[in-house]
Amino acid sequence: MIPAGLANPFAALFGGGTPIDFGKNFKDNRRILGDGKTYRGLIFGSLCGTLIGLLQILLAPHIAPYLAGFIDPSLLVGYSYIALITMPFGALLGDIVKSFFKRRLGFERGAMLPIADQLDFVAGAWVLTFLLDPEWLLANFTIWVAIAVILIIPVFHVAFNIAGYKLGKKDVPW
């Protein structure tokens, strides 16, 4: 989940430029996505998340022996190049889809929508990865791992958003 979780902060850090919706409105006369979803953010967020995943793959065999008493080390050495790309890219797609629906509901850019704001990237990462590499996803995200992710991720998400806000990369701390 680390590549997926870090894709969004990297998108915010390196984003800007041309909005994905090109500034266009939907048929409800509201922006399709808003200025916060840009091609540069999508590309660099996905790329940075993928590079973090690659770093995990390279380090896992060296770290696995030290975690033998805590987790099954074999879990750290199985990887998928498809998931390496789909997890961060899917995370950002999940955020984009959520933004589309927030605009339809009348939420402005930066407005808080609890739970959806914390788990949109998880849903996007899992859905895209399930569509393109279901075996890897189901082998790595058992029901208990999925529950742990759903419970733990919101805490990390809020912490990263507060950090982004304090660094001046986010307009709001959520």
From Swiss-Prot:
On the tree of life, the source organism's domain of life is: Archaea
User: Looking at the UniProt record for this protein, which Gene Ontology cellular component terms does it annotate, in alphabetical order?
Assistant: plasma membrane
Major subcellular location class: membrane
Q: What class of enzyme is it?
A: transferase
One function term, GO molecular function aspect: CDP-2,3-bis-(O-geranylgeranyl)-sn-glycerol synthase activity
Q: Provide the E.C. number(s) assigned to this enzyme.
A: 2.7.7.67
Question: Where's it found, cell-wise?
Answer: Cell membrane
GO biological process, alphabetically ordered: glycerophospholipid biosynthetic process
Q: Pfam families this protein is in?
A: CarS-like (PF01864)
UniProt keyword terms in alphabetical order: Cell membrane, Lipid biosynthesis, Lipid metabolism, Magnesium, Membrane, Phospholipid biosynthesis, Phospholipid metabolism, Transferase, Transmembrane, Transmembrane helix
Q: How does it sit in the membrane?
A: Multi-pass membrane protein
Q: Which cofactor does it need?
A: Mg(2+)
- Reaction(s) catalysed by this chain's protein: 2,3-bis-O-(geranylgeranyl)-sn-glycerol 1-phosphate + CTP + H(+) = CDP-2,3-bis-O-(geranylgeranyl)-sn-glycerol + diphosphate
Which pathway is this protein engaged in? Answer: Membrane lipid metabolism; glycerophospholipid metabolism
Q: Where are the transmembrane segments?
A: 51-71, 74-94, 112-132, 136-156
User: PANTHER family this protein is in?
Assistant: CDP-ARCHAEOL SYNTHASE (PTHR39650:SF1)
Q: What does this protein do?
A: Catalyzes the formation of CDP-2,3-bis-(O-geranylgeranyl)-sn-glycerol (CDP-archaeol) from 2,3-bis-(O-geranylgeranyl)-sn-glycerol 1-phosphate (DGGGP) and CTP. This reaction is the third ether-bond-formation step in the biosynthesis of archaeal membrane lipids.
**Family the UniProt entry places it in:** Belongs to the CDP-archaeol synthase family.
By what name is this protein known? Answer: CDP-archaeol synthase
Q: Which gene encodes it?
A: carS
